[in-house]
Amino acid sequence: MREVNKYLKAVLVIFLFFIIKVESKILSIGDTDAKVTVKVFSSLTCPHCAKFHETIFNKLKEEYIDNNLVRFEHHAFPLDLAALNAEIIVRCHTNNETKFKLLDEIYKKQKSW
């Protein structure tokens, strides 16, 4: 029984470490001190998410994010393996601006891939 408890504790520590590392890598754009934070959970293969990104996000970015009034967070919610793989590709880049440009391209070309 003690061996099982040690094993469970080790798994829990690793799991918590992973969660903490993932949380610190939120894909965001805008002022970190903005009074408003918009959190969007989306799948890169969802047509409704693409529509939001192509229409509303660009206006939101131009009017509010670029003026440091809003911080925008993109949270991955992959609905299938293709969305997960696309999200992994986005996360490989180091700069958030580049990541958001890649998100633009992925959403624009969503129907073709």
Could you say what each language-model-derived stretch is?
Residues 32-50, 72-73:
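Short active-site neighborhood of thiol/selenol oxidoreductases, capturing the structured segment around
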